[in-house]
Amino acid sequence: MTRKILIVEDECAIREMIALFLSQKYYDVIEASDFKTAINKIKENPKLILLDWMLPGRSGIQFIQYIKKQESYAAIPIIMLTAKSTEEDCIACLNAGADDYITKPFSPQILLARIEAVWRRIYEQQSQFIQIDELSIDENAQRVFFQQQEINLSSTEFKLLHFFMRHPEKVYSREQLLNRIWHNDLEVEYRTVDSYIRRLRRNLAPFQCEHYIQTVRGSGYRFSSYLRDKQ
C-alpha cells in the first residue's frame, strides 16, 4: 500500500516542515493550502489526510463534511491539526468525522506516532493483503507473490518477510527479530537470524527483489523498496 498523505495547511512554513519530516520517514506527501486545492488533490488518492481547521474560504470541518459525502473518499482517515484547543472544539471535530485531533504547537514525533497509530487501526488490522511495489503477501493463505508469480517460502521465511512488510523502512536488530519471530527461543542464536535472512534473500533473488531485505551495518536489518540502498 502506498503511504501517501495529503497535508492541508494554509501556513506555508508549517506545511513545508511537516512535508519534509514525513518525506524523511518515507511517506509520499502531497500538499494543499486551501479548500479548493485540497478537493483537487484528493483525486490523487491519499491514504490519510492531515487537515488544518482554519483554511481560506471554507473550514476544515466543512472539508470533512464534504469528504464524508463522497463515496470514493469517505473512508480516508483524517487527523485535524489546529490551534483550537477547547473541549467543545475537539468534540465538534471528532463528531464531524475526524479520526484524531492534535493541537498546535505539536512535536513532529508526536504527530508521527499519531499518524502511525491511525494507520495501524484503519489499515493494518483490517487488511489481509499487503503489497509493496509488485511484491505482495496474502496473509490468510500465507502465500507470497511477485508480479502474480508465487514465491515459495518456508514457514519461518514467510513470518520474517511478513513482519518486515508490516513494518517497512524500520531497522530491527537481531535481538528484536529473535523476539518477534522466534519469541526468544533459547535454542535460537543470532546466527540463526542471519541464516534465515540469507535464505529469504536467496528465494527472492530469482524475482529480482532480494534487495528489499537490507543490512544496516551495526544495527540489523530492514525492509525497504528504495533502490538507492540496494545491496
UniProtKB/Swiss-Prot annotation:
4-aspartylphosphate: modified positions: 52
GO cellular component: cytosol; protein-DNA complex
Entries under Gene3D superfamilies matching the protein: 3.40.50.2300, 6.10.250.690, Winged helix-like DNA-binding domain superfamily/Winged helix DNA-binding domain (1.10.10.10)
Domain Response regulatory: 4-119
Localization annotation: Cytoplasm
Pfam families cross-referenced by the UniProt entry: Response_reg (PF00072), Trans_reg_C (PF00486)
CDD domains per the UniProt record, alphabetical: REC_OmpR_PhoB, trans_reg_C
Post-translational modification: Phosphorylated by PhoR.
Top-level lineage group: Bacteria
DNA-binding segment(s): 127-225
GO biological-process terms attached to the record: phosphate ion transport; regulation of DNA-templated transcription
Gene Ontology molecular functions: phosphorelay response regulator activity; transcription cis-regulatory region binding
SMART domains recorded: REC, Trans_reg_C
Keywords assigned: Activator, Cytoplasm, DNA-binding, Phosphate transport, Phosphoprotein, Transcription, Transcription regulation, Transport, Two-component regulatory system
NCBIfam families: PhoB (TIGR02154)
Biological role stated in the UniProt entry: This protein is a positive regulator for the phosphate regulon. Transcription of this operon is positively regulated by PhoB and PhoR when phosphate is limited.
Stated name of the protein: Phosphate regulon transcriptional regulatory protein PhoB
Taxonomic source organism: Haemophilus influenzae (strain ATCC 51907 / DSM 11121 / KW20 / Rd)
Gene designation per UniProt: phoB
